[in-house]
Amino acid sequence: MNIDGIEQGISLYSFNREFVTLPDYTIEDALDDLVALDVQQYELVGSVFFEHYPRPDPAEVERVLAASEVRGVTPFSYGGYMDVGRITGHDPGPQDYILDLTADLRTARELGCRYLRETNIPIDLLPMAAEFADYYGVNIGIEVHAPSKPSDRHIQEQLEAFERIGSERLGFIPDFGCFIERPAAPALDRHIAAGADPELLEYIIANRHSGLTEDQMHQRIREMGGGEAERVAIAEFFGFLSFGPADLDGFTTLLDRTHYFHSKFYYVTEELEDPTIPMPALLSAIVDSGFQGVLMSEYEGHAFQDSDAPLQLARHLRLEQQILSGSAKQHEIRSR
Amino acid sequence: MPTSYMKLPYEDRVLRPEALRSYDLETGPVGYSLDIGLNYYRGLPLSAVESLELTVDAEPVPEHLILVELNGKLFPTSQLSAAFTEFWPIKKDLRIYVFNGGIEDGPHQVDLRLILRCVYMQFAPGVWGMIDNSASRTLTLQGER
């Protein structure tokens, strides 16, 4: 659906549990699930869906294009990776980054994607990245992903570099996982089911931002009687499920340099509320910035709960539609 | 400090019930094979294997009896770290061959310790995120494929 210039897309990573655990679930099945949600734009992550990476076999690319065409859907963006640690014991240098960037740009171009998502490009290589993006006619977005936050120094330095270089090819892809305010109940339930003490989990959550490092927290929880289940929870809460007060001010600094958004989510209730991520605040900042482009829903609840990706995505799309319709009206009123 | 050992909830697919199979030739039993699935959300280069240790019925399997097969190629465990152009896709198993003359029919306790380097997650020079792909399961020896 397109609401005042903001179009909803879906990252096929949302169907990760299905793809990984069901032997017969294919890219075609993922695209069928996409179509059933009435969404046309999607992101494909190469290292998930291709058997060959960083360069897929031409037949694999052909298969994605054919399956897309017959369903009337479009690969909007390609999820690449800087797998620069693939050579054991080797400290990656510029050549390693350029190799991976080039491989992903080629694949993105072959898929007809307008955007390539990259995980990290060193600042001194960004001018070259912009040049390569011109060669391939593909824009490069650097994902701002938890545990990073938009206000972090390294993100702001990237923003300054984008401004300095001045190429429209370079931009950000903020991932809403940066704005988790508190782990969702299903995430906690999984640790409790694995044997974690609910009180110790609460202690970890309450003291996540007390200045303790991950190791110090682990040590303290061990002293309080915690074990392996709590260690796994700590690793998660200091890693991809890092949480804290949402960095909304930092978020607004990136908006003029944003290619599109990963509208990451973990759980939407039946009442269409996201208890983890402040969606109304994020979406109204996007509308106020005048952004026109794609909001890519990305379900990651499969990281800790049995998946019902289609149901969760349907709720998330409706939640976004509700907020966007309201925000668009508000914005119109404020602009008069 | 960064996330140390990530463990995703796909552990059930590391050692599937039918993963352990006898490996026989017309000359008799040669050993057995074990299929290993990834407990991760994406594929990884084979060189991401940091350590692979197999214990069957509480006996560690000596490294020199093991060969690892991926994409039709065989590797001793000591060479996995060099296999950076081989990609282990998420839906494909790694197959381990153990040349020990075979094991008895019936159930066997299989303990796999498999640590993988997260090749895109560097925290400092030489410091990478690690993925715990280990699993333990009692598997019943199956006939040859």
Spans of model-derived segments:
Chain B
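Terminal leader/tail segments of proteins
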Residues: 1-145
